[in-house]
Amino acid sequence: MIKLSNITKVFHQGTRTIQALNNVSRHVPAGQIYGVIGASGAGKSTLIRCVNLLERPTEGSVLVDGQELTTLSESELTKARRQIGMIFQHFNLLSSRTVFGNVALPLELDNTPKDEIKRRVTELLSLVGLGDKHDSYPSNLSGGQKQRVAIARALASNPKVLLCDEATSALDPATTRSILELLKDINRRLGLTILLITHEMDVVKRICDCVAVISNGELIEQDTVSEVFSHPKTPLAQKFIQSTLHLDIPEDYQERLQTEPFTDCVPMLRLEFTGQSVDAPLLSETARRFNVNNNIISAQMDYAGGVKFGIMLTEMHGTQQDTQAAIAWLQEHHVKVEVLGYV
């Protein structure tokens, strides 16, 4: 549905030359929810704006539904963009128009008959859960409701693709979840292809089928969500995954934790499990093999793309030789082990 080939984008600011994208290629199949994650300034907004040519690539080709956009005339491009809806971090609603009027706007600009506009807008507002808000104005809506209006407006022309530019980053966590569930439902009902960009791995984890990691204008890692969470290949992907798990050292342990070993101490470990290592009974196996005992302090597990992953804080009791052997064995079995200190 979306095929980007060798996309490069260069900006010129006075005497400065900024390369925002460098030889980016990616294919997003029809009906898929595809996420692009990266830090601020990584190039993700430039990338998504190249899909509908809000930013025209310096080099490369953009195919959407088999049509090469970079060679179209302005009138042809305007027509092609009707098949590409887009929502943003800021909702860009017209304050002087009602909810109905905002959703109806693209249909009015396309000279759609009034009866058809009424039918289509009513259908869309029901789809996004705002069937009772036809006559409300944006000033009377919550942030989540405003984004729902923006989604309905983006779908008014019955597009095949929906682009989401940090669409939930201005929303609170509960509202973010509801908007993501709405996007997932729309994808399922309409078979809509969704390309979203975000700096939050929680967004990717919740609804995406595949994900690409962008850094300094390049896609440095890309795969299914389950594969990236199970076997992240780059430090940046690992960092984003770690950001979805929050496990603090309890206060009483913080007070006792030492950076260097001391008499009768035990190491405190941070264990990171992904993929097959989550389900395997590795801690009980270390106890059996190496005569160590693990005192679990706290743990957190989660799912992404049907795959479990998680982290655990534990004290490992045993001789120095046995604990070192147990740690090495865990690492051999794809558990990331960090010695936080000694207690």
Swiss-Prot record:
Gene Ontology CC annotation, any one: Gram-negative-bacterium-type cell wall
Residues annotated for ATP binding in this entry: 38-45
Keywords for the protein's UniProt record, in alphabetical order: Amino-acid transport, ATP-binding, Cell inner membrane, Cell membrane, Membrane, Nucleotide-binding, Translocase, Transport
Subcellular location: Cell inner membrane
Recorded catalytic activity of this chain's protein: L-methionine(out) + ATP + H2O = L-methionine(in) + ADP + phosphate + H(+); D-methionine(out) + ATP + H2O = D-methionine(in) + ADP + phosphate + H(+)
Topological type in the membrane: Peripheral membrane protein
Domain named ABC transporter: residues: 2-241
InterPro entries the record matches: AAA+_ATPase, ABC_MetN_proteobac, ABC_transporter-like_ATP-bd, ABC_transporter-like_CS, ACT-like_dom_sf, MetN_ABC, MetN_ABC_transporter-like, NIL_domain
Main subcellular location of this protein, as a coarse class: membrane
EC number(s) on file: 7.4.2.11
Signal peptide per UniProt: none
Pfam families in the record: ABC_tran, NIL
GO terms assigned for molecular function: ABC-type D-methionine transporter activity; ATP binding; ATP hydrolysis activity
EC primary class: translocase
Record-stated family: Belongs to the ABC transporter superfamily. Methionine importer (TC 3.A.1.24) family.
Protein purpose: Part of the ABC transporter complex MetNIQ involved in methionine import. Responsible for energy coupling to the transport system.
Subunit record text: The complex is composed of two ATP-binding proteins (MetN), two transmembrane proteins (MetI) and a solute-binding protein (MetQ).
Name this protein carries in UniProt: Methionine import ATP-binding protein MetN
Species this protein is from: Shigella flexneri
